[in-house]
Each structure stands twice: as C-alpha cells, then as structure tokens.
C-alpha cells in the first residue's frame, strides 16, 4: 500500500515537473533527442549542445511538425529568448547550461527572459551570472549572417565584373569574325561572278593559256645564262695582223662567201711564181713589207714605176681588204675613217733599209698581162681577167665558228630582250660594241658605189703613171 502511494506521488511530481517546463523547450528537446532526425538535427559530440545540419530541410519538415511554422529565423529568436547562444560561427550550433542530453528534468531551470524595461530591478544572482556568460543568440546570428551576405555580395560583384569584361571581349571577337566572314562572302561572290563571265567568254581559256605560256617563256629567257667573252679572245681579236705570221684577220659579214673568195684569189696571186719579179714591174702595190730601195720619197719606184701613194691604198674599203697597219698619217683617208670598222692604225706602209733583202716575194700582190702592162688586181678580179682559187687562205682566216666571232654573232640579242641584257656595265659595253659593229658593217655595204668609184680612180692613176 505504501509502495503504491509512493509511485503515485512520483508520478504526480513528474507531471508537475513536466508541466513546469515551457512547451518550446520540451518540443525542442524531443526533436533533438529523436534518433530519426540525426541527419538534420542532433546532439553535438559533447552532449551539451545541438546542431542543425540541414537548415532548409529542418525548416521544411520539422518546424511545421513541432512548431506549426517553417520560419527558421523565428525559431532562432525563440532560442534567444530562452538564453541559448551560438557556439560555432561556421555552423548552426546552439547551447545552454540547462539543455543537456539525458537530463530533461533540468529544463525547468531555463527561464524565458523578459524585456529589460519590464524586468524587476532585482533578480536572482544565479540568473545574472548565467545571462552574463551567454551571448545573445539572435543578435549574434543576424550579424554573422549579414557579414556572410556582404562577403557573398562582394564575391558576386567581382564575378559579375569579370563576366562583363569577358562579354565585351567576346563581343569584340564576334564583330571581327563577322567582318571577316562578310569580306570572305564578298570575295566569293566576286570570284563566282568573274568565273561566270569568264566561262561565258569564248576566248577566255585561250587567252589564259597564252598568257601562262608567255609568262613561262619570259621566266625561262630571263634565267638563260649568257656567255661573257674571254679576255684572251678579245685581245686576239683586237689585233688586225699578227706580226710574225702576218695572218689576215677580218670580220665575216653577210657577204662572207664573196669576200672570202676574193681574198683567197688575191692570196693565190701573191703566192704564184710569176710574181717574183713584181718588185720591178709597174703598177704594183703593197699589202706587206717591200724593199725601201724600190720606193722613193714621193711614192714612186726607183726604176721609174708609176706613183702609188698611201692615199690610193688607204682609200680601198675594209670590206674587201683585210686590216693593215701603218705608222704614218694620211691626209686623204677621211672617207675611210667613217666607214671602216677598224682604226687607221691597222694599215702598214712599206718598210725601209735592210728589210729589202729579207722580204719575200709573196708579200707583193700584182699581175701581168700579155702586153706587159701592170693590171690593178682589184680591177682584174672585178673584170674577171684573173681567176681566183679558194683554198689558200682557209688556214689564215678565222671561221664563223671561232670563239673570236662568237662574241659578236654567236648570240645576238633579241630586240625584246634589250631591257634584260642591260643589267650590268660589262653587258652594256658588249651590247654597244655589237650594235656599233653591225651599224658600221651596214654602212660599209652601203658605200659599194663609192668603193667602185675609188677603184676606178686607182686604175686611172695607174694608167696615167704608165703614160708618163
């Protein structure tokens, strides 16, 4: 009987204790102590505080179930009124000295605070000490949240500025790409229109292929290497007569065959045995050296032969006679200065002194007729009185294929290539020499009538001398 009474008294006392605990604290304790809610809200490791792990889920599911609302800020303000404080600033962890795990009966020690103006001036000492040790949960939580929001705002502003800069750069690149695409489209349209017109034109393909061939030909001609004349060949070509061999050097022009035949016949006559006594005959004239004893100061021979002056010899055109050397000036050879391709220094007068005994009879050129009169060799050749042979002078005269003539006629430039040839001073000099030589030769052949006239005058002079 007594035991039953004690149990009833204990139940009454527990009921009285439970009735003295505020409903907010009781519901909060039951919610935290429930093991089914540990993933959202649970006790801390020290069992003297609780932690809200998932605030959105906590506000969505548990606040409506226990407190009939879903406002987490309102729940925090309720905790603040009962003296709870936020322990960790990085998470939602709240603590109170009377809120411990397994000690629900001490929740009655937690008293809800009233506003300061309403509170009596005197309060218990224990409550004062507990309030001084705690931190206002609502105030601390709001300030922390404001600071966090400000930090987030700054970060977002920086990110926004960066994104705007990237947007401007991207727009600039996009404009450039659009302009390039527009230009490419215009070029493509121009090309298509050009091709359409070209296909419609019947002579386009022929003209295009012709231009391509001309361009290739021009490139090949510009890359062609031209041979420069050898210095030794230039030196050998500059001398008209070799003093030792007395070989005759001449330029072979377009009338090469006729001139070669005439010179060979003259050489034949000079080598004939019938000309050994020409030194004493009348009307002989010189191509080489003759004895000085046969020639006087006035140009006549010692045995009364007719006068043959240097003017008569030098007036013969260079197109029919080879280059000869002389060392005395002549006053009547001005006509030859403008027509001969060689200088006056290429003529040679008769030698004097002891050279008479050493001179060969082959150096004299003359002829004898049946009546004893001396006939002019040139007139005889032109009149057909003498027969010429064309085998004597082949070794003495250079051929067209010789290197001396290749520098003049081997590679004659085309008129269209004049601009390409004038690329250096050496080439310019060679071209000018070739052009001058060609013009001189053309002038020589244009003076054929004058040469014939001079030849006739020489024949008349010879006849007059014989009459005297």
Curated annotation (Swiss-Prot):
Biased composition (Low complexity): 277-305
Pfam families in the record: HSF_DNA-bind (PF00447)
PTM info: Exhibits temperature-dependent phosphorylation.
Region annotation (Disordered) ranges: 211-244, 268-309
Location of the motif AHA: 402-411
Gene Ontology molecular function terms on file: DNA-binding transcription factor activity; sequence-specific DNA binding
Summary of the function given for this chain in its UniProt record: Transcriptional activator that specifically binds DNA sequence 5'-AGAAnnTTCT-3' known as heat shock promoter elements (HSE).
Quaternary data: Homotrimer.
UniProt comment concerning the protein's domains: The hydrophobic-rich region (HR-A/B) corresponds to the oligomerization domain. AHA motif is a transcriptional activator element.
Name of this protein: Heat stress transcription factor A-1e
